[in-house]
């Protein structure tokens, strides 16, 4: 009887190892490509010596549209250039379990049902946990609102749809205009027919 329990236990261990490796490979795939991704902690630390805005891609391992962004949008040369030259680009797993200490507050993972969420993700997204979601922080770690009343930019975006938002923040246009007015004057590096503001 004891031997049969051990035999049942071995396949469970093997499955756990396979899924753990798959999850690790998936995380490493998020960090591959032309964008120089870093952790939230690394971006905050780097900001202490060289001030720069922070772009945060809030994702989860189960989010299909997050994977499409990783495959189609972030590898785009124009998107990667804007991110690398103007921001500290951060990948933040909204379900990561490690604590993060930021400005004297410890943000923790909150188990909920079969999954859970990280308190930092909830704070960044104003408790609107949908993925993918994108947050911009200024050089003093304040959230830069893209739309009036919204702290984040939710949803999948193609490169030509995403570029105006990145250039809006990178060029500090958010300090003097709203995104709707900016898009009317925005000059796209993509074809005019597929870009908001150039139709």
PLM segments and residue spans:
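Sec/Tat signal peptide C-region and signal peptidase I cleavage site
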Residues: 19-25
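Thioredoxin-like thiol-disulfide oxidoreductase module
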Residues: 77-80, 84-151, 159, 164, ...
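Detector for the c-type heme attachment site
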Residues: 67-71
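Short active-site neighborhood of thiol/selenol oxidoreductases, capturing the structured segment around
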Residues: 50-64, 89
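Non-globular targeting/processing and membrane-anchoring segments
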Residues: 26-32, 138, 144-199
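A short beta-strand-turn-helix
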Residues: 36-53
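Bacterial N-terminal signal peptides that target proteins for export
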Residues: 1-9
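Bacterial N-terminal signal peptides
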Residues: 10-18
